[in-house]
Amino acid sequence: MVRSGSVVNVQRHRLPNGLRIAVAPISGLRSVATLLAVEAGQWFEPAGRPGVARFCAQAMLRGTTKRDAKSWADALDAIGAAARLDVGPHAATFSAQSLGDDVGELLALMAEAVVTPAFAPKEVELVRQQTVAQLEEDSRNTRAVAERVWRELLYPPAHPFHARPIGDPAVVRAATAEELRAHHERAIRPDGAVLVVAGGIEAKRLFEEAERAFAEWSARGPRESRSVPSVSLGGTVRRIEIVPDKTQSDVVLGWPGLPRTDSRFVAARVTNMVFAADTFASRAGHVVRDELGLAYYVFSTLGTSRGQSPWTVRMGVNPINVERAVSVTLDELRKIVGGKVSEDDLELAQDKLVGELDVARESPGGVASLMLEGEVFELGPDHVERYPRELRAVTLDQVIETARAFLPPDRHALAIAGPPLPVAD
């Protein structure tokens, strides 16, 4: 735990192959949290092949050129470590927890999976079957359907964010081990990766263990330049997708967001909390669920990437309340855009966001996550300490201007998934 008021001492090192390393030693702890983020998320997928990045990442955990999937998992279990690999819009992130004494072995296993995956035919087929099964389950899940439809409304087919990270069923069924290897060679590179460690370990030892584990990780040729195409909404787009045998509707209402590197992003995070991030500190969340009882849940999120990740409000609603829940949400947004928001609203949102940071600092995993955003997007060496002050510095005028710039109430994408909506009288 990082004591309240104390400084997170982040120390950095870069390996000759380009891998950037950041470590925050925390005295009094035996455990460590380890995150390896490779900038190989959706934005780095081949055009027209949504799902390849996630498929590749999942297959990387199914055996290496040195040991099969069971042996690799057994070696991880032997040191009491837990690990996973997730893919988002920007990065493929390997996350693990272990004792500080076992970091060397953990990094060696991590390097095996990331640098020398086998992509054995049997294991590739297993990942394919699991992914197809998940996609089939998602086709009956109103939350997943609403998100898929919303992305299709906002992002054109060639855009990397058009599909969910899990991808398109046709792509998953057709992808070959050779395609996964090609994606791995092109995208999984040390010069686009960041290793972050927080917890009970000294920086010098961590740097030495990382050098030993990742020294052979190399890349062919210069890193491919990538950018995310911009998108905009000229008006309101709406689609209802009927999901059989359901009694609840799920709603996604949203807009294209802004890059994490945009100078207005911190103000956008505060604006998101003022608007609908939860039901305690947010205007729409509190009114729609707690005051009017129109939704089972309400929350909003603002994605982080180098492009316009989704900025969405999500709701679970009785079909008879869908239209009113959406209308009330937009009315609350119009109040913010119109300047009808108070300093109390702002202070409550800032208290919630800074409080979440304080909670995150109580665990190695939370500290590592705070560090990772700053390292991946190169937000400055003092990002972890500066960020709470930046949240507090956001003004009411900035919240209003941010809402006007990015959340126009009359230009939005709306996806509704569930049973048919009742016909209005």
Q: What are the language-model segments listed below?
A:
Residues 5-7, 77, 235, 399:
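Residues that act as N-cap/strand-start positions at coil-to-secondary-structure junctions
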Residues 47, 105, 262-264, 324-325:
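Solvent-exposed, non-transmembrane alpha-helical starts
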Residues 18, 25-76, 150, 263-276, ...:
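Active/ligand-binding-proximal structured segments within catalytic/core domains
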Residues 41-44, 203-204, 259-262, 320-323:
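Short beta-strands and strand-coil junctions in structured, solvent-facing domains, enriched
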Residues 1-31:
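N- or domain-start disorder-to-order transition segments that initiate the globular core
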Residues 9, 32, 90, 235-237, ...:
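A generic structural signal for well-ordered coil/turn residues at beta-strand boundaries
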Residues 14, 22-25, 71-223, 229, ...:
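Charge-rich, well-structured scaffold segments of protease-associated domains
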Residues 22-26, 33-40, 222-281, 287:
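His/Glu-based metal-binding/catalytic segments typifying zinc-dependent metallopeptidases
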